[in-house]
Amino acid sequence: MVINLRGTSGSGKTTVVRGIMAKGEVVALEGTTGTAKKPEAYALDVNGLDKPIRIIGSYENVCGGCDSISTQDEICRRIEVYAHQGHVLVEGLLMSHLFSRYAMLDRKLFAMGIPFVWAFIDTPLEVCLNRVRARREARGTTTPLNVKNTTDKWHDMRRVFDKCVKQRESDWKKVIGYKIAKLDARWVSHENAVEEVFGWLS
């Protein structure tokens, strides 16, 4: 199973991943010492799971995930490679607002018998904004937050959810090579997201 956590800044995507990482033994794939690059992914083994978990991206910084990966194609390549090794957990701010590229990946993996879950975290906008403000204060940023970008992205994410479930022809024009389908899109409770997402893997 591939689980793509989606949410705007401050929604808790990275917090969910770190919560799941805390449930087992984590090994970085592609070393991080010296001048070596950041990890390509992490291997997570959890007692009781039938498959290992692969977590895409780097979690060396406070805000982890895939946003430091250079292209969406590279993210998709890693997802596809690691999906053949076990479960995959992936998140990032940029990918949270994209549909067509990941609908194509969804359908490609589905044809191989690998489920793809679009997991949208239901964090209220004001909570997201407050968390972003807190991060800025922790960094020493004193200028007021321009809320427009986070607000716009919060609404964009909801539009992507609609595209997943409403099967509109206009939304699928750029999903090249695949027929319109209802995708497995789910809302995740921001208050219990770690246990809810982990439960899908158990």
Descriptions of predicted regions:
Residues 2:
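Walker A (P-loop) ATP-phosphate-binding motif of ABC ATPase nucleotide-binding domains
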Residues 14-27:
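A conserved segment at the C-terminal end of the G1
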Residues 91-92, 112-134:
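Conserved phosphate-donor/acceptor-positioning beta-strand/loop module used by diverse small-molecule
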Residues 5:
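Hydrophobic anchor at the beta1->P-loop junction of P-loop NTPases
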Residues 39-100:
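Conserved nucleotide-sensing/catalytic segment adjacent to the nucleotide-binding pocket
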Residues 24-48:
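Switch I (effector-binding) loop of TRAFAC-class P-loop GTPase G-domains
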Residues 10-12:
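Conserved glycine(s) of the Walker
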Residues 163-202:
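NTP-dependent small-molecule kinase module
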